[in-house]
Amino acid sequence: EWLPQNRADVWEFQADHRFGEAMAEAKYFFMTHAEALLHGDLHTGSVMVRKPEGSNEADSVKVFDSEFAFYGPVAFDVGATWANYAIAAARAYALGEDDRAHWCLGLVGETWHAFEAEFRRRWPERRDPRLWDEEFLNRLLQRWRNESWLFAAAKMSRRIIGAAKTTDIETLPPEIREGAARGVLRMARSAVVERWADSTPNHFQELAEWLLVEARTS
């Protein structure tokens, strides 16, 4: 259950028809776009990274808890990860850890750019280069980037007022939890609109920083 102080935020959320339409689109993509084998419940707690002492590079990355794996839209896992960063940033802002919040949101861009670089590296291995050319690749990546905002919005809202709430927010003291929850909900609602104006990770970061800081309470 959400805090009584967030009741008005929930009512505004429920009355947001544009968000409802966007979630219908997200659910349709989820059910019909079998593009890749996905983790299905990806968040930072599902990833283990090993870095040798004295090195800045990881030599091993393991992802576990794959019981929800399925064939679905590529952007689903990407968006889920972005949402996790935003929620972690909301907690950090609520606790006054602004530098940590900025770092969390900076991971949105790092994650996307690493994904895009790896996908482009593997692109020469595609089955039919005559059909799927570089222009097709650019359009595909742009679509996935846009859809990542959509699935991030779905995940953010679900983690605040849905059945699978996040301890990042739930364990905050009520007086600061109120603003953190409000900020995440506002980011979710804004994301489904702002993705059409600018779907870059940098815009996601800037928008989240502004909304989360504006909403925080003390």
Task: List each language-model region with its residue ranges.
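Active-site activation/catalytic loop segments of kinase-like enzymes and analogous catalytic loops
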Residues: A75-R127, A152-I169
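ATP/Mg2+ or Mg2+-diphosphate-binding catalytic cores
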Residues: E135-S218
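An acidic intrinsically disordered interaction segment
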Residues: A34-H39, H43-T44, E116-L131
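Catalytic activation segment of kinase domains across protein kinase-like and atypical kinase folds
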Residues: T44-Y93
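Secondary-structure capping and boundary motifs in well-ordered enzyme cores
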Residues: A34, H39, F70, V74, ...
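Acidic, serine/threonine- and proline-rich low-complexity regulatory regions
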Residues: G96, R100, R126-E147
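ATP-dependent phospho-/nucleotidyl transfer catalytic cores
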Residues: E1-H39, R50-G54
